[in-house]
Design a protein with these regions (language model features):
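Conserved glycine-rich cofactor-binding loop
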Residues: 22, 29-30
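The beta1-alpha1 cofactor-binding region of Rossmann-like NAD(H)/NADP(H)-dependent oxidoreductases
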Residues: 55, 76-88, 120
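Conserved mid-core segment of classical short-chain dehydrogenase/reductases
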Residues: 86, 107-124, 147, 167-170
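Active-site helix of classical SDR
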Residues: 138, 174, 182
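Alpha-helical segment proximal to the catalytic Tyr-Lys
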Residues: 143, 187-188
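Residue(s) in the substrate-gating loop at a strand-loop-helix junction
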Residues: 158
């Protein structure tokens, strides 16, 4: 599903322009991910909205995005499966052009339970999602970004790992690991 450029009529006035840029925002059919996609589109970027499970919600979010006058596409795919990530990136590139901005905002459900009610498998599932996803997404995008000598990778973090939120330990641990990985990647890749 794609949209073509139209004169944007948006509620936000931007102090910067992303005209000529293309963004991929994972988990962008609801909440923060959708707000980020809309803001990037408002600033003139072509944005690929990503979803995995709920096609109807994805299509509704994309229509909401398009109604703002922004250009983009909707792409389904898993952000924790290497071959699927490669397919997502290739599809966005063929539809919108090279990706300049990658926003990693996808998230699974985050239940609240006492520590003793979680098992290690659920902790591992959270770590797999919040560390594996940014790693695989960055690994897919870095060669492309380095080749064109431009790119931005934005990982959406959370303050929960600093605050130690109770009944949320798997998510807190995973977001702490994601934050450490992101800081290390930023130090390695900074100009």
């Amino acid at each position: 599903m794609t949209s073509s450029p139209r004169e944007a009529t948006t509620p936000r006035a931007h102090q910067f322009s992303l005209e000529g840029r293309t963004a991929l925002v994972t988990g962008s059919t609801t909440g923060l991910g959708l707000a980020i996609a809309e803001s990037l589109g408002d600033a003139g970027a072509k944005v690929a909205l990503n979803y995995f499970n709920d096609r109807e919600r994805g299509e509704a979010a994309f229509e909401q995005y398009r109604a703002r006058g922004a250009e983009g596409c909707l792409v389904r795919g898993s952000v924790i499966d290497g071959p699927d990530i490669e397919r997502i990136v290739t599809e966005v590139e063929s539809t919108l052009g090279g990706i300049d901005i990658l926003v990693i905002s996808a998230t699974p459900d985050q239940p609240h339970h006492p520590i003793e009610e979680y098992d290690w498998a659920f902790h591992q599932q959270m770590l797999d999602f919040f560390v594996k996803s940014p790693f695989l997404m960055a690994r897919a995008m870095l060669p492309r970004m380095k080749k064109k000598k431009f790119g931005r990778i934005i990982n959406i973090g959370s303050e929960v790992f600093r605050r130690g939120v109770p009944n949320f330990s798997p998510y807190v641990a995973a977001k702490g690991a994601q934050s450490g990985w992101t800081r290390s990647m930023a130090s390695e890749l900074a100009p």
